């Protein structure tokens, strides 16, 4: 395991038990609407099989299960602590695996989703290539990820929240300050907008789009497998 993967595993493993409540409180509950929007987009594609990578406690995978009751929805994560919580919430197909090295054959899924997980992977481009590998031709990718707001004032306020407030609030909720300090740094460093779309094109996808939500605090990216 690489140093980055070990660091991420340690951080998220330590906050697994309070991961859901912390996310909902720190986002003031808006994270529900973000996942709902993502789930509606995927539903409109009418997939028969979906792999939700970095599924965590399964929120997006569970939303897809409700909207696509006849589809096979695999929730993939490399943390057994997270998958156990996802199973307790009703995830039907948990898969313990690393998103960088998926245990699926080429073209296994109509769609791959990943919510708030891509920036945590050591090599974003390689991860996109692995996602492309397991998606069927003309299948779809959806990425839901944090980004920086588009307006100057909102961006400044958001950065203050990310770097000054969030680590303290996250620590009080989970007892783990480093995970939430890392969150702000990883959002700053992650490619967004056109840069993210270009990376998708360079790693097996066509027709990329992006849709900022909540002033650009998060962005939904979609693309089609070549």
Model-inferred region functions:
Residues 1-18, 162, 173:
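N-terminal, positively charged/glycine-rich alpha-helical extensions of SAM-dependent methyltransferases
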Residues 100-111:
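A short acidic, Gly/Pro-enriched loop at the edge of an enzyme's catalytic core
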Residues 28-48:
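Conserved alpha-helix/loop element of class I SAM-dependent methyltransferases that forms part
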Residues 49-101:
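Class I SAM-dependent methyltransferase SAM/SAH-binding core
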Residues 125-140:
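A short glycine-rich, Lys/Arg-flanked "PGG" loop and its adjoining helix->strand segment in the class I
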């Amino acid at each position: 395991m690489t140093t980055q993967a070990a660091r991420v595993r340690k951080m998220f493993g330590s906050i697994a038990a309070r991961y859901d409540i912390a996310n909902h409180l720190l986002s003031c509950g808006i994270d529900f609407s973000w996942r709902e929007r993502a789930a509606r987009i995927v539903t409109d594609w009418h997939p028969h099989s979906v792999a939700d990578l970095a599924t965590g406690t399964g929120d997006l995978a569970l939303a897809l299960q409700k909207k696509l009751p006849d589809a096979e929805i695999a929730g993939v994560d490399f943390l057994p602590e997270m998958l156990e919580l996802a199973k307790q919430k009703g995830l039907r197909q948990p898969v313990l695996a690393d998103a960088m090295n998926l245990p699926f054959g080429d073209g296994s899924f109509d769609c791959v989703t990943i919510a708030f997980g891509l920036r945590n992977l050591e090599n974003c481009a390689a991860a996109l290539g692995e996602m492309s590998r397991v998606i069927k031709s003309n299948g779809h990718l959806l990425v839901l990820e944090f980004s920086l707001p588009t307006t100057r004032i909102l961006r400044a306020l958001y950065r203050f929240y990310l770097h000054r407030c969030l680590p303290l609030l996250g620590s009080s909720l989970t007892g783990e300050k480093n995970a939430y300090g890392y969150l702000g740094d990883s959002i700053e460093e992650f490619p967004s907008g056109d840069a993210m779309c270009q990376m998708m094109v360079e790693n097996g996808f066509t027709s990329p789009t992006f849709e900022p939500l909540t002033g650009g605090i998060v962005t939904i990216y979609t693309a089609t497998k070549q």
